[in-house]
Amino acid sequence: MKDKIKKLYGKLRKVQQEVNYEGDFQTWDEAKKRCEGYDSDAIFQKVTNAAMQVKEGKALFDRDSVLFYEEEWNYPLIAWFQRIAAKYDQRLTILDLGGAFGSTYFQNRAFLKNSIRQMQWIIREQEHFVEFGKQNLADPELIFEYDFEKIAEA
């Protein structure tokens, strides 16, 4: 499994090196200052508030800060996870790129815990999301990491 993650890491680094920008800006930082995205403070505050409500048991899961109070299993995803786990002695490691604060993990974990013996859900996100997740949401199954090399070692 570690070899597969290292191979994926290599491919992602290559794609990252090929990323460029166009426009009337001299630098990436100059362009970034003129736009707002998912890393804005307002969005971060909203999604962290929702994530903490899930952690505190006030909601079952959230999706982009929208709270859900009833179970909504993602059956196609669960079926694939179970199929993969069946090949690996009911053990499953998931690398969730852009997984926010584990919304898909929280949505499906109760179902998966009944059928998968050992699960590790690794979320790779923006650095400030990872830091918040490590400090407030991580547990033995749910891991937050920014560095692909550390992910490959997990």
Region roles according to the model:
Residues 3, 75, 127-131:
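Generic alpha-helical secondary structure signal
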Residues 1-37:
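Membrane-proximal basic amphipathic "stem/tether" segments
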Residues 96-151:
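Class I SAM-dependent methyltransferase SAM/SAH-binding core
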Residues 34-90:
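Class I SAM-dependent methyltransferase Rossmann-like catalytic core
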